[in-house]
Amino acid sequence: MIELLYCNINRKECIMATREQEWEELLGIKTSGRDDSHSDGEHHPYEPTDYCVLERLANSGLIRKKNTLIDYGSGKGRVSIFLAYQTGCHSLGIEYDERLWQKAMLNAKSPAARQRVSFVLADAAAYEIPDEADCCFFFNPFALHTLKRVLGKIFDSLERKPRPLRLFFYYPYEDTEHFLNQHLRLIAEEPIDCRDLFDGDDKKEKILVYQVRSFL
């Protein structure tokens, strides 16, 4: 495991090809670039989470080797592979777009995955999460009404097997944040502030963190 790199540069610099290439080459994966060819009102475009944000999440200590992470809308697999590599956790990516899923499967062959990463081609709203999953990551992969259905599946899993479970929401839209903060099953924790990593003062540059109540 390499020493975590601290990124304190603006947004344009953070997504420069040189910065992307450093991590892409180290991990042996290809995940860069935005793709909105299959986006619609239900599913948002593919845009990988910046590596500097993932570094900050890994540095938080909230995800450890003992954890099993689900990345909803995993795209080409960056989040799953990076966090498994840096924290030692097991990671499972859920993706509905077969083309992106196939690219993730190719990336999963990287030694960085070390048999701790897997990807599933599935509709997140219908997917039954494994009972060992205890962390979930979201980067606005789908519309709010779909998120509600996904949360329902997470709650169902907790009813089958009560356990601590933490949710991470990067760059949340205002309506999503309001919904989450008002939800009776969610306990808000200290968010991970990422505004200093980018140009300007974008209030959405953060990772919201919630603990899920097993029962009301």
Question: Where do the model's predicted regions map?
Answer:
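Conserved SAM-binding strand-loop segment of SAM-dependent methyltransferases
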Residues: R114-A122
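A short SAM/SAH-binding and catalytic strip from SAM-dependent methyltransferases
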Residues: C135-L147
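Conserved class I S-adenosyl-L-methionine
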Residues: K66-G75
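S-adenosyl-L-methionine
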Residues: I2-R64
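C-terminal substrate-binding/active-site "lid" region of AdoMet-derived donor-dependent transferases
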Residues: H145-E205
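Conserved SAM-binding loop
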Residues: A104-M105
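Glycine-rich SAM-binding Motif I of class I
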Residues: G77-I81
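Conserved SAM-binding motif I beta-strand of class I
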Residues: H90-E95
